[in-house]
Amino acid sequence: MFCYWGDDVRAGFGLVKPDGVKKTTSGVFFCSPKSRIKQLAPGKGLVGFVRGEGNVSVIRVPPAGGLQCGRLKNLELKDKIRLMSCGETQAVLLTYAGRSFWMDKHNHCRPIKELSSWNVIQVVCGDQHCMALTQDGHLFTWGQNSSGQLGLGKGEPSFLSPQPLKSLCGIPLAQICAGGDHSFALSLSGSVFGWGRNSAGQLGLGDTEDRYIPACVNSLTFKKTVFISCGEEHTATLSKGGTVFTFGSGRYGQLGHNSFRDERRPCVVGALWGSEVSQITCGRHHTLALVGSSKTIYSFGCGEQGQLGNGQRTDQCVPFPVHLPPDANHDQSVEQIVAGGNLSFVLCSQQEADNSSVHPESNRGRGILTLGDRMIDRWISECDSNQWRTIKKEIKRVFSSEACLNASFLKKSCDEHYQTSTSFSGLDMESVRAAVKRLAQKEKVLLEVGKIVEKDLLPSLGSTAVGAEALRVYLILPEILRVLNKRLHETKLTVELASALLKLNPSMLQALVKYWSELSDDFLKPLVKLFHKPSAHFVSQRTFNRQAESSDGHLQNLVHVLQMLYKVSCSGKRKITSGDFVIYEINVLFEICTLALLNSTPCIFNLEAKCNLLKLRQVRTCFRLVLRRSALLEDCFAQLRTANQTALKGWLQVVYSEKFEETDVNKRDFFLNVFRTLLEPESKMFIYNDTKTLIWFPAEPSLQEESYFLFGCLCGLAFYNNSVVNLPFPLALFKKLVGIQPTLEDLTELSPVLGRSLQYVLDYSDEDVDCLDMTFKIIWDNKEVELDPNESGKVVTSSNKKEFVDAYVDYTMNKSVERVFEEFKRGFYKVCAQNVVQFFQPEELRGVMVGTEEYDWSILKKNATYEELFYARHPTIVSLWEVFDGLSEKDKKAFLLFLTGFDRVPILGMNQVKMRVRPLLNSTEDHLPQALTCHSLLELPMYQTKRTLEAKLKEALYHKRGFWEE
């Protein structure tokens, strides 16, 4: 049965004889054409009918009050038509084979040659524009572009031929829809994109500004939208649960909101709430909704031409049932409702209601290709048969298309993929891995996939799609490349993928990084290996082949991706370690120009390489400090105060006015003594913890803030000149220098008692916390402080205990020292390049500056070398080590200070101390041992007895160390 109502038209549209058309009292006409109508395509000025056998008829319908309706005309086409869509005067037709035809106002049809090589699955028409969706997910638009309805960008002209809509490239589309002068696209995971005319808010974006490129309707995010229909100036959407949203023009009540006002954002049609609507359709100014379970059709909007089917010719702003013929309510089921122009249609059949009543998404037409188990199994089982040519074509269609891959492997359990966002991909990674594993069962199939990925897919990546669904391909591809690389032993595909990743716009790249953070270690670790292996290859190539400069760009891209993955691995508890990122080959690559390319990716450097990089500064100038021994700190600060930034970055030379000579010994002794002076309590620069082992900045400094700036410069000089100094700060200082916020753990290091107390507060039960009688008032650095200045005396409770602890840590580590720390930081970075410092983790930075206390004396002895008359079994050397082994730990540290100028071990360990021993020329047993600290050189008289050696060595260790203790 075929029902219709609305504009005055030829009886039965000419599908049946006039006497075969019946009419109800409510103005609904119905008839039973001999040839089954498969699809209806009403437009603003014509209606198309697709018959069950694929033949097409059209009839021209003039505007209301215009000329008489035309006659039904059959189109002479050799191809069988599956689908058609009509605009104001034109139509687009689609064959079962995916060929598309254009029908002009004279009903003449011609193939759309620009789409001849594409398998089209959906076509839609607005008043004067058209869209076509292909099987591999490409969207084309053409026609009038007066309001941006083609989505090609502002200022683009109208086009007579189809143009690719690149801004939606990669989005797996489920449906396309066109209104008067606006357009919509719906993704498989329910994202809604609109563009074009927005005069009444019909795009649902909260305003009335036209859009010239697709914009995501955020109000419909997570609503599980499965279908869209557009009127001339309004839009309706349907969710999977049967909820209807409408927006745009409400002038005729077509929104169904019990008002005639426009809505700029999607609003639920309240009268249909809970009815589980299964189909919706929009006419020019009216809307229909079908509740499949009750076979009830509701109408609302403009009724001037009787298009509401209620026997009235008045507008209606709330949904009311359409009075269908009795047969439609009893013996027949509603297959499809369609509205267009000022007409409404219903197709009924004798059969039981099929899925079209329950799942309105079937009304979209065919969907884009997806990669699934059946397809893969067929490829594997038939690839050695005469079907291989067909299989190759399918592989090309799927693996050359971002959209097809993005439509595959969705998490459909509990409709999870409808929650896709910039923080959730909606992708089932286990299914991805299983599918790739099956593909690898036939090398012939896998290699063909690799060929298409390399030739077609990878070069097309890097677009700036407007939706998160376009990013799934970047999670799928690594799984494919991982298997391909094992078979092919190549890296070029990974290089191309890295390049594509870095072409993504920043917001999309940030979303992808979020997706990575949600991956389990089983998927993240192979991802790290995928980019690490070619990175190491290029570094090795660069190390041993100076002609490999052409690969520097590839290397830079690869390590950039590695650095992003490193940050992901650090964000949670992972089995992935920092060692998984280190490229050990870089330790022998000391070419400045290449290392400069890698200076933003510290994850690939181990500590040894970082320290070597620090030594490789391209500095040719020196920064000279000329100091008086008696006014060391005063002279130092005076010269730092006036030094320019460029000069400070030179290699440090220290000269004493009393004895004008340049030696590295001067520099080491300078740092030793100047830091000793600054850290004495008498300097009043710092506060000490309870055990006097660590220092921190004061909340109320008694010295000028400039002192901390100069202290920062001094610390910067020590760092840049590879000098280990006494800097007993907690790790918090080094965290703050590299932009990492201190935590309760850092406060506990500074003040163990306080830190443990705060941890107890967090661990206490709610009842215990409420009984503590604590407030947000604390004492720090002998000063009372309200941690919540907006609420004096605020009580600590179970609900705010974390807030209290966080505020305590923030005050002690940040707020209380903000001014002095910022001065210190400013001074430090006046000397040091920030990107160099941030190469180091906080623990590494502290280790480089302060050294470690891992004293492995056996390594010192093992690495010692002997010169001139000395050798390992020389009696004096044997006595030396016997004496050394008998020294106390304090004396051994004093020996290290005497030998190197540092009393702590370099961060890389005792292996870095290369002790040399030679005889002291022209010496007697009365002479003390001497040391050249810049060379770790011990000059030792040839003492006749071990006893003499021991006495003289101990005397030397604690002898007054030079100039200022005369």
Can you say where each PLM-predicted feature lies in the sequence?
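Hydrophobic, conserved cores of late-appearing folded domains
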Residues: 569-760, 820, 845, 923-925, ...
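Conserved core positions of repeat-based scaffolds
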Residues: 4, 46-49, 58, 90-93, ...
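Surface loop/turn motifs at the tips and blade-to-blade linkers of beta-strand repeat domains
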Residues: 29-33, 73-77, 112-116, 121-122, ...
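Short coil/turn segments that connect the beta-strands within blades of beta-propeller domains
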Residues: 38, 44-45, 53-54, 82, ...
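Blade-level signature of beta-propeller repeat domains, shared across WD40, Kelch, NHL, RCC1
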Residues: 296, 302, 313-369
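Conserved beta-strand position repeated across blades of beta-propeller domains
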Residues: 41, 85, 93, 124, ...
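Short glycine/serine- and acidic-residue-enriched loop/turn motifs that recur at repeat junctions
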Residues: 2-39, 50, 57-77, 94, ...
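C-terminal catalytic/scaffold cores in eukaryotic proteins
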Residues: 353, 365-368, 373-478, 482-499, ...
